[in-house]
Amino acid sequence: MGDFNDTPSDKSIIHGIKTMSYPSDTTSAHSLYNLFSNSEQLAKPGSHKYQGEWAQLDQIIVTGTLLDSRNPMHLIPGSNRLFTPQFLFKTDKTYHGTRPFRTYYGYKYEGGYSDHLPLLVDFSLPLAP
């Protein structure tokens, strides 16, 4: 999980890490699945904005085991999303629209959070006995 500095469709993600698309019709316990591979539908506007362009540079990659609902701990289908509350954004005076409310904008301290938006995913966990 984290900032890969590449989009889900980049060769480094697909061929380098060998990720599969999610959701997938079939899953294998030994394969890796990028929960943000279908970012056009999942992650609007994207997790990072650079020179006016949003891109999904942050990924959560899991094994097929976490996609199997028969396992005690598993991903809740459809729970992968960007966290986009209004307080994480600031007006983008240069490129218009909004941008993440960053801690620093160049050398200027803004007091924000990050230049990337957070990713969220929900897991089902077994109850303790």
Residue locations for each model-derived region?
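Active-site flanking residues adjacent to catalytic metal/cofactor-binding acidic residues
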Residues: 1-3
